[in-house]
């Protein structure tokens, strides 16, 4: 059995077309959804991510503002910029690209963003809303994973889901989203005693640790759905995920590729969150 691919590029195109349609309707009512992206320093990977986000906005009919600052920018200066963007009615979403320079407290900056504009879903108010099932913005990567499961028509009720990784950005919110859909969820991490014993019981596995080959074919139950959030490089310098793709695809029922799986979905859900922030603001 060879797994069916869950094509993140194709699903992203569908969702972005819907974003563009809804953005056009908002514009007719006098509101153009706006995203501000703030980049501090010259981290090469961050520059690529930021360019992709701005490009995606433009292609979907969203207004975007890119603010670039020198790595020497002070924390107080950055907080002042965030405050100004909070009070700018043309901006509906604020994204401060991480990582920030070491002298800036990233959590303090995230908490300075208005929860109404927290389209990354990292604010403690967003985390609390997710925990309690209240309306709020979901972190984009796990949100994208959920959309992929929805796209293949997968019913999570009563299923056993294993999340490998416990970060605040992916692992923890992923577990909560799966739980909200009535899955039984196990979260594994670096201190998990026997990872294979856990994953072999799983109907759904989400790998999100940032380490190659953390999940191999002998660790996967036949027919399981495997979502690969990892972004690594192999020995030839090519992009790869956390999953041994060639091996696992022969066992799994569905699998996401890297690249072309979760990656494009992350940016797409940022657009969805920004659009929804604008719709809420417009009333």
Curated annotation (Swiss-Prot):
Coiled coil: none annotated. It comes from the Bacteria. Catalyzes the oxidation of 5,10-methylenetetrahydrofolate to 5,10-methenyltetrahydrofolate and then the hydrolysis of 5,10-methenyltetrahydrofolate to 10-formyltetrahydrofolate. NADP(+) binds at residues 165-167, 190. GO terms for cellular component: cytosol. InterPro entries: Aminoacid_DH-like_N_sf, NAD(P)-bd_dom_sf, THF_DH/CycHdrlase, THF_DH/CycHdrlase_cat_dom, THF_DH/CycHdrlase_CS, THF_DH/CycHdrlase_NAD-bd_dom. The keyword Oxidoreductase applies. It comes from Paracidovorax citrulli (strain AAC00-1). Belongs to the tetrahydrofolate dehydrogenase/cyclohydrolase family. Its EC number is 1.5.1.5, 3.5.4.9. Homodimer. Pathway: One-carbon metabolism; tetrahydrofolate interconversion. GO terms for biological process: L-histidine biosynthetic process; methionine biosynthetic process; purine nucleotide biosynthetic process; tetrahydrofolate interconversion. Keywords: Amino-acid biosynthesis, Histidine biosynthesis, Hydrolase, Methionine biosynthesis, Multifunctional enzyme, NADP, One-carbon metabolism, Oxidoreductase, Purine biosynthesis. HAMAP family: THF_DHG_CYH. GO terms for molecular function: methenyltetrahydrofolate cyclohydrolase activity; methylenetetrahydrofolate dehydrogenase (NADP+) activity. It catalyses: (6R)-5,10-methylene-5,6,7,8-tetrahydrofolate + NADP(+) = (6R)-5,10-methenyltetrahydrofolate + NADPH; (6R)-5,10-methenyltetrahydrofolate + H2O = (6R)-10-formyltetrahydrofolate + H(+). This is Bifunctional protein FolD.
């Amino acid at each position: 059995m060879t797994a069916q691919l869950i094509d993140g590029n194709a699903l992203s195109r569908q969702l972005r077309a819907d974003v563009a349609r809804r953005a056009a309707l908002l514009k007719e009512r006098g509101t153009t959804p706006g995203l501000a992206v703030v980049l501090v320093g010259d981290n090469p990977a961050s520059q690529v991510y930021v360019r992709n986000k701005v490009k995606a906005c433009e292609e979907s009919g969203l207004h975007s503002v890119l603010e670039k600052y020198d790595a020497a920018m002070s924390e107080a200066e950055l907080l002042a910029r965030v405050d100004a963007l909070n009070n700018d009615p043309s901006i509906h979403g604020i994204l401060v690209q991480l990582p920030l320079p070491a002298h800036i407290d990233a959590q303090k900056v995230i908490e300075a963003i208005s929860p109404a504009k927290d389209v990354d879903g990292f604010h403690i108010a967003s985390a609390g809303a997710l925990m309690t099932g209240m309306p709020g913005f979901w972190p984009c990567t796990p949100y994208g994973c959920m959309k992929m499961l929805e796209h293949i028509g997968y019913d999570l009720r009563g299923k056993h889901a294993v999340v490998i990784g416990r970060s605040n950005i992916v692992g923890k919110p992923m577990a909560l989203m799966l739980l909200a859909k009535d899955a039984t969820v196990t979260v594994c991490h670096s201190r998990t005693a026997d990872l294979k014993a856990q994953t072999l019981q799983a109907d759904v596995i989400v790998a999100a640790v940032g380490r190659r080959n953390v999940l191999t074919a002998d660790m996967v139950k036949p027919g399981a759905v495997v979502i690969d959030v990892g972004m690594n490089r192999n020995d030839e310098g090519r992009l790869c995920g956390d999953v041994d793709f060639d091996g696992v695809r022969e066992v799994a029922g569905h699998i996401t590729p890297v690249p072309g799986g979760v990656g494009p979905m992350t940016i797409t859900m940022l657009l969805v969150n920004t659009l929804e922030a604008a719709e809420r603001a417009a009333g």
